[in-house]
Amino acid sequence: MLKVYNTLTRKEEEFKPLNEKEVKMYVCGPTVYDHTHLGHGRTYVSFDIIRRYLEHIGYTVNLVINFTDIDDKIIKRANENGKNPKELSEQFITVFLNDMTTLKVKPADIYPKVTEHIPEIIAFIEKLIEKGFAYETENGVYFEVKKFENYGKLSNINLEDLFSGVRIETSEEKKNPEDFALWKTAKPGEPKWKSPFVEGRPGWHIECSAMSSKYLGEQFDIHGGGRDLSFPHHENEIAQSVAYSGKDWVNYWLHTGFVMVNGEKMSKSLGNFVTIEGISKEYDPEILRFFFIQRHYRSPIDYTAESITHVKNNLEKIYNVIENIRISLEKSEKSRVWGENEVLLYDILKNSKRNFYEAMNSDFNTVEALKSVFEVSNGVNKYLSLVKTPSEGLLLKAFDFFKIVGEIFGLFENYFKTSSESDDEEFIKFLIELRSDLRLQKNYEMSDKIRDGLKNLGYQIEDNPKEGTVFKKINI
């Protein structure tokens, strides 16, 4: 039974989607004015793993991630760079999507943009005005927070405490300081759209309510984002959406923890951020994914060069185990009679697989799940060191375990091949045989070219006096 931690209720709850086999999920996307950094990467990799696990246990996931492609920050950056806001936002949408591909994050089903949903946003605002939750002024439309009875439920504090010491937008035309903008009048030179109110553009919070309701309906299962979005963004989304429909909006609220640098949150405003584009030139994306799952998705994680190096070394140990299984399968026996060593490894595999699922069913606890991965790794290593002719069935069970882990965590991609990749492997074997013939003919120049070419493709050749020439997949 899957349980998830719900920020709204502050406890783990049994996961029951509205539709038995379908999960509707909305994750707040980026405001596209700059490069994606490691903090963003942590959020989207975390929800990618959550999505992968839900799909693994039988759900169909309908995932929506929005793009905020018009915003004060976008306008400011566009003016600084001498670009129009549309040009700038499209540039960084491309950067974001490329970064997600690099991180092996599966694409969302829909990536709606604010600028392409202005009619839906206007209609949403009109209904809020009609129902008495919003009011017009000369310069826009505001949501009247005091009209919404349960405001602050997500943040777990009352309205007075909520705004004590918090910097909020003030305006003489607002009824109350805490009221927030649904529609803003455009300043000279800014992008603007015609509306029944004033010519202008949407406020930040209304976009997610309008776009999620269009693609997922007035009620859906999971709303996610970084912890910093819980207030005011998600609090305001709840107010708008429940006021609009009169229904409970989202069943489960999930929030990811920060990536920390020297005790501070990684952020653009502090200038302590590391871009995905930059770090992926130095480290394989699987190392970054493996780094993120070292901590529970709700917990903060500290980024240091040392922590990445430590993660890299541990991941390479697992790669070596998977490669050793692949090589050992060639000398394994189907009918091997089981002895003490086989029974021991079988028990490790059975218990570790059970523990892995128990961990993932407990709010996607990757930290505990990883313990099972290392237990299997150690068990396989010990088994292969003790037997000369291993059991094929046991090795296939171990191989299958790593395949499942890889599918859920987005790891070990190079070790689990499609049929086309298997054809590639046959071609590589042919090249190795050709290289051996060239070496016998003492044509070392051509044989070295084959060796170096295969290395560039991610395959390392090892000449072993006992086993002949073998190859293994490496990360390049």
UniProtKB/Swiss-Prot annotation:
An MF annotation (GO) of this entry: cysteine-tRNA ligase activity
Record-linked SUPFAM superfamilies: Anticodon-binding domain of a subclass of class I aminoacyl-tRNA synthetases, Nucleotidylyl transferase
Name of protein: Cysteine--tRNA ligase
Pfam families: DALR_2, tRNA-synt_1e
Catalytic class of the enzyme: ligase
Entry cofactors: Zn(2+)
Catalytic reaction equation(s): tRNA(Cys) + L-cysteine + ATP = L-cysteinyl-tRNA(Cys) + AMP + diphosphate
Residue ranges of the motif 'KMSKS' region: 265-269
Motif segment ('HIGH' region): 30-40
Chain sites annotated for binding ATP: 268
GO biological process, one term: cysteinyl-tRNA aminoacylation
Gene behind this protein: cysS
Family: Belongs to the class-I aminoacyl-tRNA synthetase family.
Keyword Nucleotide-binding: yes
Entry EC no(s): 6.1.1.16
Keywords in alphabetical order: Aminoacyl-tRNA synthetase, ATP-binding, Cytoplasm, Ligase, Metal-binding, Nucleotide-binding, Protein biosynthesis, Zinc
Positions bound to Zn(2+): 28, 208, 233, 237
Subcellular location: Cytoplasm
Source taxonomy: Archaea, Methanobacteriati, Methanobacteriota, Methanomada group, Methanococci
Gene3D superfamilies with a match to the protein in the record: Cysteine-tRNA ligase, C-terminal anti-codon recognition domain, HUPs
A GO cellular-component term linked to this record: cytoplasm
Cofactor binding description: Binds 1 zinc ion per subunit.
